[in-house]
Amino acid sequence: MKPYKIENIRNFSIIAHIDHGKSTIADRLLESTSTIEQREMREQLLDSMDLERERGITIKAHPVTMTYEYEGETYELNLIDTPGHVDFSYEVSRSLAACEGALLIVDAAQGVQAQSLANVYLALERDLEIIPVLNKIDLPAAQPEAIKKQIEEFIGLDTSNTIACSAKTGQGIPEILESIIRLVPPPKPPQETELKALIFDSHYDPYVGIMVYVRVISGEIKKGDRITFMATKGSSFEVLGIGAFLPEATLMEGSLRAGQVGYFIANLKKVKDVKIGDTVTTVKHPAKEPLEGFKEIKPVVFAGIYPIDSSDFDTLKDALGRLQLNDSALTIEQESSHSLGFGFRCGFLGLLHLEIIFERISREFDLDIIATAPSVIYKVVLKNGKTLFIDNPTAYPDPALIEHMEEPWVHVNIITPQEYLSNIMSLCMDKRGICLKTDMLDQHRLVLSYELPLNEIVSDFNDKLKSVTKGYGSFDYRLGDYKKGAIIKLEILINDEAVDAFSCLVHRDKAESKGRSICEKLVDVIPPQLFKIPIQAAINKKIIARETIRALAKNVTAKCYGGDITRKRKLWDKQKKGKKRMKEFGKVSIPNTAFVAVLKME
């Protein structure tokens, strides 16, 4: 590391919508500052997971320290890369709290999108210096002036410092580095000497344990210090080493001082011990107040995960345990289902988080799993005044005891071309949405603000939005309040027995159509037996939809060649009695494909 000068440090982040070129610009910055040699360079260097590269998204925040010579001075540039998706908005807010500036990257052909809007507002709340960057300027469809106008009018940013660049060709990259030095303010000199460091992420390393990523606000942290976490008021730990991201995590001598970004290792073994947004201080000279903005991360969406082969239960348990080491937001609870066997109830930050965990289990651990339909946390107010929070249909109390139920709602911003307005309004109406306002983003695009139940968002809202806008629509959401709703438990009965894996909590208005569609799907995927199988959807024991799987026909008179009809009749009567007995005592075996088909449909 170069000699320490707080006025020569610049901490910045990159804000961008999915696929607007954030990771590619980060690659070019690393190249231009010679942080990484050309022969070691690969695309999306900071996106370490295969899944991040394939989907073109950032899931984990990746910091990196670069040095750059400008006008005879050496500057330390700390890039704190952030996830772009709305599911990870708390991590984004903590990463932004570690910065003084941000690059707002906008695709010069596509313009401002919903997720970049959400993160820009987080940056503006923190009073960061925002530098607009128009990427993909080399595309024939690029409209730099129109996009500048969008940024000015809709976000309210001054675009006089806008940089036109192409991460593909490298055009505009030196200008970005110079703008960071000129426009992003250095960290404020600390007013106190006690250590105060913001935790913005953590990572589990199998060799050294937990690496805690910090931005030092005041004081310094060095090897041998005894530190504690202020918000969680846990036990104290000895710092075993400190390091910087160059771009790989590299241990170093000396200390991390005010304004700098790096990591430390202590004898921490679980990511749960380290909370994002917490404040680190020393035991000997503790800071008086923790940094503002800390809150516990709580899961929003829940789903059950079961192994298709029950002998894989221990492997699944191990897989979830390993994923949890690097993901403190993932919650795991063991549960059992009458039809699916033993599995886990898991909590996620949102639908993307859930998809990523499922995909990583399948890929990294080579497991075949079934996931139940995603659910949210409902509030149940009982007649005796008690309040319950449930995320699982099996926890639904006796309807006679319920005073009313409430469901979580969200504020949604949708950006769409004008021609799809009526399609989106129909979609939101179908999802029980309430339109708050409509604004013009430019002469071709609109921003629609809606309130929607979270349960309607977590099912298939994104797919349907992409479908009705031919892929041009984008949205982001933030959690709102709970509102009263007619939420009921829908049960599916197969041969008069309820199958818990198909039960779900739905709004009364949607119960009949949902029940009917599940019954129709099951008729197609459950193989016929030797007796009729009724498939029914029920609410509070009342049947609202029914389908029947017809019995397999077995010709019991095949061995009778001619002869008396009474012989045949006797055989038919015997078969009828046998079928009746089978219907009473026979078990219907439901193939795994049936569970997968229904849960995919949901």
Curated annotation (Swiss-Prot):
Keywords (alphabetical) are: Cell inner membrane, Cell membrane, GTP-binding, Hydrolase, Membrane, Nucleotide-binding, Protein biosynthesis
Q: Name one GO cellular component term.
A: plasma membrane
- EC assignment: 3.6.5.n1
**Which Pfam families does this chain map to?**
EFG_C, GTP_EFTU, GTP_EFTU_D2, LepA_C
Q: Which InterPro entries match?
A: EF-4, EFG_III/V, EFG_V-like, EFTu-like_2, LepA_C_sf, LepA_CTD, LepA_IV, P-loop_NTPase
Q: What does the entry list as the binding residues for GTP?
A: D19, H20, G21, K22, S23, T24, N135, K136, I137, D138
Task: Report the superkingdom from the record.
Answer: Bacteria
Task: Quote the PANTHER family the UniProt record gives.
Answer: TRANSLATION FACTOR GUF1 HOMOLOG, CHLOROPLASTIC, TRANSLATION FACTOR GUF1-RELATED
Q: Which family does it belong to?
A: Belongs to the TRAFAC class translation factor GTPase superfamily. Classic translation factor GTPase family. LepA subfamily.
Q: Which NCBIfam families match?
A: lepA, small_GTP
Protein name in UniProt: Elongation factor 4
Its source organism is Chlamydia trachomatis serovar A (strain ATCC VR-571B / DSM 19440 / HAR-13)
